[in-house]
Amino acid sequence: MVSIVDNVSEVLDTLLAALSSGLKQTVESYCDIQTADSEDTLVACDGSLISIMKIEGVKALVGQEEYERIHDGILQNLSNSLAEQGHSIQVFFGYSRDKVKEVIKDNYAPTVQTLSDLKLNLDDLMDERLTHITNYCGFEEIYIVVWSKMTLLTGDQAKRAAKEKSEKISEKGYNVKTCQNVIAAIPDLRNLHDSLIKSLGQVLSSLGVDAETLNVHDAVHAIRSILDPEFTDKKWRPVLPGDKLNPKLSSTFDGDISEVLWPSLAHQIIPRDAVNLDLHTVKVGGLIYSSVFIDLFPKEVQSFMSLFNRTLPTGI
C-alpha cells in the first residue's frame, strides 16, 4: 500500500513540475540552455546548438567609411548562411558605470603588485587615480550568440532525432528535470553549426574585428554575470559534463542516476528567484529588467551609436 501511495505521489509531483514549467511559473523555466556539447558549444532544451563569441574590439579606428566596409563585408559573406531558416544570431551589448571601477582596478593590479614588491607605499596616489579615471569611463561588453536550430533539419531527420533521443532517455532511465540531459544535442546539427561558427570567425577576423569564441565555462559565466552580477563571483564556473563531480548521496537514495549527474544548468545560471514588479518589468537582485521593442526600423543603415546616444541619458 505504501509503495502505491509513493508511486502516485511521484507521478503527481512530476505532472505538477511539468505544468509549472510549461506555464513559466518558475524562474528556471525561462532558461533554454540544457547542457554543453563540446568545448565551445552549448545545447538548448530542444537540441539546438549555441555558441557565444565575445567581441573585444577592432584593430583600427572606425569612421564612417570603415563602418560601411565592415557592415558590407559581414552582409556579403554571411547572407547565404543566415538565409537558412534554422540559423539565427543574437547580439548583446552591455554598458555599466558600476562595473568600470572593478575593471580598471584589475588593469592596475600589475602596477600595484610592482609597488608592493618595491615596498613603495603609494596607495593614496593609486586610489586617487582610480577614482579620477572611473569618472570618465564606462564598462562595455559585446557578445554574438549563434544558434543552429532544429528547423535546419528535414522533417525525416527531425523525427528520427526526436525518436532516438526519447529512446536513449528511456534506456538510461534518469530524470532530466533535475540534472543536465547530456544527450540533448542533435548530432545532425553539429557540422552545420561548426561550419557557421568557423565562417563567422574568419569573416570578422578579415574585417579587423577582434572576436573570440568562448569556451562553455566562460560562456555560462558570462550569461550569469550579465543576469545577476551581484551574485556571481569572478572565479565562479558552472559544473558541466566532463567536470569532476563529488556527489553526496542522501539517505533516501533510490538508485536514480540523475542524483549523481551534473546538476541542472538552469539552477546554476539563475541562482535565485526574481520578482515581477509588473507585466513589463522584473527585478533580479538590485537590477530591474524590461523590454524595448523597435517597431519601425530606419530606412537607412545607422551605427549603433545613434541608438546608444538616445538611450544613454535615460539611465538604462
Describe the function of each predicted region.
Residues 2-316:
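Extended, folded cores of ATP/NTP-driven motor/assembly subunits in large transport
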